[in-house]
Amino acid sequence: MRGARGAWDLLCVLLVLLRGQTATSQPSASPGEPSPPSIHPAQSELIVEAGDTLSLTCIDPDFVRWTFKTYFNEMVENKKNEWIQEKAEATRTGTYTCSNSNGLTSSIYVFVRDPAKLFLVGLPLFGKEDSDALVRCPLTDPQVSNYSLIECDGKSLPTDLTFVPNPKAGITIKNVKRAYHRLCVRCAAQRDGTWLHSDKFTLKVRAAIKAIPVVSVPETSHLLKKGDTFTVVCTIKDVSTSVNSMWLKMNPQPQHIAQVKHNSWHRGDFNYERQETLTISSARVDDSGVFMCYANNTFGSANVTTTLKVVEKGFINISPVKNTTVFVTDGENVDLVVEYEAYPKPEHQQWIYMNRTSANKGKDYVKSDNKSNIRYVNQLRLTRLKGTEGGTYTFLVSNSDASASVTFNVYVNTKPEILTYDRLINGMLQCVAEGFPEPTIDWYFCTGAEQRCTTPVSPVDVQVQNVSVSPFGKLVVQSSIDSSVFRHNGTVECKASNDVGKSSAFFNFAFKGNNKEQIQAHTLFTPLLIGFVVAAGAMGIIVMVLTYKYLQKPMYEVQWKVVEEINGNNYVYIDPTQLPYDHKWEFPRNRLSFGKTLGAGAFGKVVEATAYGLIKSDAAMTVAVKMLKPSAHLTEREALMSELKVLSYLGNHMNIVNLLGACTVGGPTLVITEYCCYGDLLNFLRRKRDSFIFSKQEEQAEAALYKNLLHSTEPSCDSSNEYMDMKPGVSYVVPTKTDKRRSARIDSYIERDVTPAIMEDDELALDLDDLLSFSYQVAKGMAFLASKNCIHRDLAARNILLTHGRITKICDFGLARDIRNDSNYVVKGNARLPVKWMAPESIFSCVYTFESDVWSYGIFLWELFSLGSSPYPGMPVDSKFYKMIKEGFRMVSPEHAPAEMYDVMKTCWDADPLKRPTFKQVVQLIEKQISDSTKHIYSNLANCNPNPENPVVVDHSVRVNSVGSSASSTQPLLVHEDA
């Protein structure tokens, strides 16, 4: 049997040799040149059923060798002429190559068709950004259709993903993008009408390096004492680990420093971070110098330097004070400011008054700031100084190595005050006065009982004596005059004066015989009485004129109105004076330290202040304080109290300026609210016009921490509910380019105990996503007000404030706005009204409703997307303007508004109030325009809002006919005349 088999094989070999000259699948050689071996069967591809015998023969006069390359690139060798595989398996699918001694080869590709195994799957799926990646899923059966790539969960592949199938190798993904990272795919094909799928492949993308590393150090200068430990951490950020870094000392040539500790980690898929920690355990003076942190990748290099200065011992250097001699008028405030450099940091700081007592009295306060690593500022504010409080004020500061001091000489200028003037002693008239600077006493005489004398007394008749001399307090001066110089009945005036002011006293006397006696002036029909009557009459006329003008001028009132009920076409407002006030809001006014004025109007002002112990007993926080001017009348005081009650009634919301406290007893009413560090939105938009970026393209997420923020189910804020300290925030990254910058801002609202931010909000550019976010936030805030039955009546960009994280807050700025000089407010009757922001029913019928607020919101959107332009540009408010509003004139789309947002504006400007959307519906419309990450961030921030309340939401989808008369006290605009 074996002999028969051998003969058969020999016959096959001969047949192959005879046919080899014509077989197109085998390589051929020119006469005289070595020829490649021949393979039987003589074809480029062979299909073998699984379980059958695979038999291949290599024919060549010389030695031959078979090699088989598996689907996962392993090589199997066979040095026989024949390759026989009994019961072939699908894993034997691949390329079989025969080579001879001349190095010439011939190949055949074999498919081992297995009904149970269509795909050969092996090796993980890796790809480099901007290159091709091969999904190794070759087929065991080439006779299938629709060989392609699908997403694991049945979703659509990325729209820009393209691939090329090859049954022998797999499927090649062309031009891999970073966005494909962790994309799960399967190979798929159709056999006999049935879809078959391979195992899962997860694509891991290696980022292409397209930028230099980001290198940073927390401080660019360091000051140490000899023997202290110097530690500086350099942070290097790149897309992958293929970045080199080191510390160098510039001496002046760079010298590599080997004693460096390395730490590294991945903060997300394409965010690799490394820290190089340089430590000098015991610094010497000659260690001073410039240290450079250097990093490079295939794209380029980056570096940052920090300077070290080592001193022998600590020091305190007080900066020269321009003027240590201070003059202040009685009752005024004065700030004593000392700037100094100290290292180590000061351990003791104190103000001393007159070398014996502390200068920090109850009504004064001391403020100390660390301006930089070693620079400090200390300020003593002396409030409402009295004449007796002049003197030396000394600032003492010390640390472990040094001490220093500086002394201020404070002089309080006081108006003269006459102490004694009404006695005639031994024929002498005496006048004693005190004041600073030293008063000058002059004497005047007039006949009769007058209250003003003009005839001076000759100086030779006057004796002047300094009673007391004090270096800082009031100076007392006495002057005497001999009464014998007066020959007639009359009045003597003693007048004391200095640079601050003057005061007078009068001495009336009459002759009786040869003696002079002090007498009382006649009290009936005296010139003085007549003068008083005339003055009183003139004063009465003036008062009447002023009263008339006062009644005609606009009065301060709370813009926000709370609706009590809706009766048919009429809104009935709650009288805010009847709202309750909870004294839990009371805050001690002596714990407020006032700073600069943020805004001022005809009735009052808003002042930046520091509140001590508002949230925690040992914490200071920046707040805004509303207050009236000293000239405020009862109506203004009641209006401010009403505003306080309305704010306390509304409760807390992230997108309104929230009430923090109040001072209503022991002085004028103060309303303490949140401080918004970036001012009003209108001016913010105008500042950002030149840096506006019109883009909505997304980038990949850059930090796992912030992915957790986006996908967490719990709020990512702390639970302390502290009011935000208005200092630079912290920076982090989230999936989109704009969200990345927004998160750097918003994080200061959420995470207050992490790395300081690289950028402040006000340094970042403005883009379309910011405008959409502002639109969304203001709509949310107005929806909250509507849920509390509150109508705003003056919604505009000027009444929206901006704080850290670019969080918008709706406010009523009427108290601190000078509407008399604001062209946005037009005088009608006794009111100044923002006509260009008002709905037609508000202009012509004085109707203020939820729907009129929606109209104003549409105008606000126009302001927003025009980056702070004035609405109806170039159009004055006159009869022509009123006519155009009545006839349905509406503004065209602003330059930067997407079509969808202009559609929202037009729905807000519907002439029929009932057809305008509610704020709840506006929120839903804008939610479709903003990114999911922005919505999620906003949701997290809303959950973090301190002391949240859960108001009962009133559904305003049940609309009423709003065109009715208003209970507002504001007068309606007069119907205009046609142009």
From Swiss-Prot:
SMART domains attached to this UniProt entry: IG, IGc2, TyrKc
One CC-aspect GO term: acrosomal vesicle
Catalytically driven reaction(s): L-tyrosyl-[protein] + ATP = O-phospho-L-tyrosyl-[protein] + ADP + H(+)
Signal peptide: 1-24
Side Cytoplasmic, residues: 549-979
Keyword Ubl conjugation belongs to the record: yes
UniProt keyword Flavoprotein present: no
Residues with glycosylation annotation: N146, N296, N303, N323, N355, N370, N466, N489
Extracellular compartment segments: 25-527
Positions of disulphide bridges: C58-C98, C137-C187, C152-C184, C234-C293, C431-C494
Effect the entry attributes to changing Y571F: Abolishes interaction with PTPN11/SHP-2
EC number(s) given by UniProt: 2.7.10.1
Record family assignment: Belongs to the protein kinase superfamily. Tyr protein kinase family. CSF-1/PDGF receptor subfamily.
Name this protein carries in UniProt: Mast/stem cell growth factor receptor Kit
Native organism: Mus musculus (Mouse)
